[in-house]
Each structure stands twice: as structure tokens, then as C-alpha cells.
Design a protein with these regions (language model features):
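Metal-dependent phosphoesterase signature
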Residues: 1-32, 40
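Residue-level "hotspot" positions that anchor or transmit function at local structural transition points
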Residues: 25, 46-47, 78
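Asp-based, Mg2+/Mn2+-dependent phosphohydrolase catalytic module
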Residues: 31, 35-38, 51-158
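Surface-exposed, interaction-prone regions with an acidic/low-complexity signature
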Residues: 43-44, 71
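Hydrophobic beta-strand core positions in alpha/beta domains
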Residues: 45-46, 123
Length: 158
């Protein structure tokens, strides 16, 4: 466990260095999807376990901070994912009932948290492919953000 904590701290340090140096890049399709959401006046929050100070810097460097109506960060809730707190707070801040909200997640704990909050979970796997539990908890799974963007376009034109 001590070795795990050391590795976790080293990873966090490298991540924050990359963020500060402007080395982080958006995944393909994210900016276009966020633009569509904004253009269609769909309320949008970011619910992340990362501290607000770091998130604000990252989103500013990436040029997407203005796409989010609310930022709900790990230092703003008592319990982190897989507890539903961060998603419930995001829905509350947006004034949207969880059952009427989508949560887009790439992690198992994020999917668990959003599902526990009663949200419609969209999984876009990153490092780990979905297992049976994730397939059960997610409303839909896309290979990439383009799939989710197309899904939104169908919903808003239906």
C-alpha cells in the first residue's frame, strides 16, 4: 500500500506538471461535442474528482472552460466516486433532476457513481474496456466522443 501511495503521488505530480506546461490535449471529438451542447442550450457541468484549482487551470489551457455552466470538483464534496455525491451536486447546481441528466464517464468508479445518482450513464471507455457490470449500469457505450455527439444530435432533432 505504501508503494501504491508513492506511485499515485508521482503520477499526480507528473499530471499537474503537464497541465501547468500546457501539454494536456483534448480527446478527439470533445470540443465539437461541447460546442454542440452549448449551441443547443443544454445545461452542462463537469463533475470531476480533481481539485477545482487544477481543473480551472486545465480547462482554461485547453480552451474549453466556457463550455461548462458549472464545475463540481473533488474538493467540493465529502465523498468521492464511486459515491454519487459529485453527480447529485452537479444536478442540483444545474437545476436538473438526475433521472433527466446524462453523465458521460470513462472510468468504472465514475459509471458506478452516476448510476447510483440515478442518471443516464454514457460510457466512453478509455484505458479499461467495459465489463459485465459496466454494460449493465451504462445506458449506452460508445467507442469515442463522436458516437455521443451523434446521439445528442438525434435527441435534439427528434
Amino acid at each position: 500500500e505504501e508503494r501504491y501511495e508513492v506511485l499515485k503521488a508521482e503520477m499526480a505530480s507528473e499530471f499537474h506538471r503537464a497541465a501547468a506546461d500546457g501539454e494536456l490535449v483534448l480527446k478527439h471529438g470533445v470540443a465539437d461535442t461541447l460546442k454542440l451542447i452549448r449551441d443547443k442550450n443544454i445545461p452542462c457541468a463537469l463533475a470531476t474528482s480533481t481539485r477545482k484549482e487544477v481543473v480551472t487551470m486545465e480547462l482554461t489551457n485547453l480552451g474549453v472552460i466556457d463550455y461548462f455552466d458549472k464545475l463540481i470538483c473533488g474538493d467540493m464534496v465529502e465523498r468521492s466516486k464511486p459515491a454519487p455525491d459529485i453527480f447529485l451536486k452537479a444536478c442540483g447546481e444545474l437545476g436538473v433532476a438526475p433521472e433527466n441528466a446524462f453523465a458521460v464517464e470513462d472510468s468504472y468508479n465514475g459509471v458506478r457513481a452516476a448510476h447510483s445518482a440515478g442518471m443516464k450513464v454514457v460510457m466512453i471507455p478509455d484505458l479499461v474496456q467495459p465489463d459485465a457490470e459496466m454494460r449493465e449500469k451504462a445506458l449506452i457505450i460508445f467507442d469515442n466522443m463522436d458516437g455521443f455527439k451523434e446521439y445528442i444530435m438525434k435527441l435534439v432533432t427528434a
